[in-house]
Every structure is written in structure tokens, then in C-alpha cells.
């Protein structure tokens, strides 16, 4: 569905959604509960941990 961009220059507390994919594969954004949280060294599947 909607894609979220990497939180490279953004704060990890919020992630803005964008149509383009993340530039880095290590950083991905996932949705935690109802809020969107950026993951640093975790994939979307393992985004439950900070």
C-alpha cells in the first residue's frame, strides 16, 4: 500500500510516507501500532524493536 521513506534526515519518532522507496536497505520504516516508527537496523518484519 503506502510506502514510507527512510528516516535518514528525519526524526525516528515520525516517518513521512512517500511514493519512493528507501534509498538504503538497512533503514526502513514500519508502522508500530497506530503510529509510524522508523527502523534503523531492523527490517520491516523486525520493526517491533526500536
Swiss-Prot record:
Entry comment describing in which tissues the protein is expressed: Testis.
Keywords for this protein: Chromosome, Developmental protein, Differentiation, DNA condensation, DNA-binding, Nucleosome core, Nucleus, Spermatogenesis
Subcellular location: Nucleus; Chromosome
Disulfide bond positions: none
GO CC annotations, alphabetized: nucleosome; nucleus
Pfam families in alphabetical order: Protamine_P1
GO MF term list: DNA binding
GO biological process, any: chromosome condensation
Assigned protein family: Belongs to the protamine P1 family.
Function per UniProt: Protamines substitute for histones in the chromatin of sperm during the haploid phase of spermatogenesis. They compact sperm DNA into a highly condensed, stable and inactive complex.
Stated name of the protein: Sperm protamine P1
Organism: Chilonatalus micropus (Cuban funnel-eared bat)
Source species taxonomy: Eukaryota, Metazoa, Chordata, Craniata, Vertebrata
Amino acid at each position: 500500500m503506502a510506502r514510507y521513506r527512510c528516516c535518514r534526515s528525519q526524526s525516528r519518532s515520525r516517518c513521512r510516507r512517500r511514493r519512493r522507496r528507501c534509498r538504503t536497505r538497512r533503514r526502513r520504516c514500519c508502522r508500530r501500532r497506530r503510529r509510524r516508527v522508523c527502523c534503523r537496523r531492523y527490517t520491516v518484519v523486525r520493526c517491533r524493536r526500536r
